[in-house]
């Protein structure tokens, strides 16, 4: 995305944003966003806005190599059933009508970009604290507004978002409540028991848990939201050598695993087991 395209998107969707430091609305001043409190954020020539310039990117584990591996996996179609499930939920509710979707923790932008293509009337915002992720997202053409942003204090105006999409990212329910419109919804994608079980088995000596359960995540979700719909994705697929390497490099399970182990492990297949959950947040946590 170039600067001209970014400016065009901002001219249309500027009312959806708010300054992350003071909460006031933005105006577009040249190639910068400026709020009434005089906080200023420059538009990057590569097609995004960094609204978390204070974040130390050098300590970010979600780096360019990880997002390159994720792109290999995602563009190979492994997560297409998840995208299809999210798309069907949005289609049932909005059809061809306009709506605002915020992809919280968008990474390299696979879901946000794909949904913007499927729903051209929608305003889609992709947010991630990793600049490398947003850089990877902004390299590809499209109509998504890409923002480097802290998800605990996102630069979104209160009550302006129809749907928050949260894919494999820790949820900040109080924040989601603030940015969602009345009646707005959260679509949350969480792992289930067999998710990437081949990687867990290969890395087992270096992991704290032998198995995974989403029980605590679901319990926490149920305290904050009414579950409206749930779809399960469960499939095991063969891998090429390149795809095996990409899966091993992209998962946070590998953060605690020695690089030598990650580089010498090869997987013949991978299991994807996820829950796609559409829900409406309670007015407050119970």
Please provide the spans of the model-predicted regions.
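N-terminal auxiliary segments of SAM/dcSAM-dependent transferases
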Residues: 1-58
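Conserved SAM-binding loop of SAM-dependent methyltransferases across substrates and taxa
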Residues: 108-120
């Amino acid at each position: 995305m170039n600067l001209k395209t970014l400016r065009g998107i901002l001219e249309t969707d500027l009312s959806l944003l708010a300054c992350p430091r003071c909460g006031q609305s933005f105006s577009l001043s040249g190639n910068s966003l400026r709020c009434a409190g005089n906080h200023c954020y420059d538009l990057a020539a590569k097609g995004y806005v960094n609204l978390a310039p204070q974040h130390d990117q050098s300590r970010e584990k979600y780096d360019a190599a990880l997002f390159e591996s994720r792109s290999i996996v995602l563009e190979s179609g492994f997560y297409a059933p998840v995208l299809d499930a999210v798309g069907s939920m949005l289609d049932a509710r909005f059809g061809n009508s306009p709506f605002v979707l915020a992809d919280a923790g968008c990474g390299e932008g696979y879901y946000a970009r794909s949904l913007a293509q499927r729903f051209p009337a929608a305003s889609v915002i992709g947010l991630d604290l990793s600049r490398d992720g947003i850089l990877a997202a902004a390299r590809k053409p499209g109509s998504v507004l890409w923002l480097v942003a802290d998800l605990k204090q996102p630069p979104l105006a209160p009550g302006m978002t129809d749907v928050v999409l949260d894919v494999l990212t820790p949820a900040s329910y109080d924040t989601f409540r603030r940015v969602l419109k009345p009646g707005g919804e959260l679509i949350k994608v969480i792992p289930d028991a067999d998710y990437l079980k081949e990687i867990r088995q290969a890395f087992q000596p270096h992991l704290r848990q032998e198995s995974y359960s989403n029980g605590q995540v679901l319990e926490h979700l149920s305290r904050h939201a009414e579950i409206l719909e749930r779809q399960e994705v469960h499939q095991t697929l063969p891998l090429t050598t390149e795809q095996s390497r990409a899966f091993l490099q992209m998962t946070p399970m590998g953060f605690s695993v020695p690089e030598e182990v990650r580089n010498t492990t090869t997987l013949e297949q991978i299991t994807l087991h996820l829950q796609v959950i559409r829900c409406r947040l309670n007015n407050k946590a119970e």
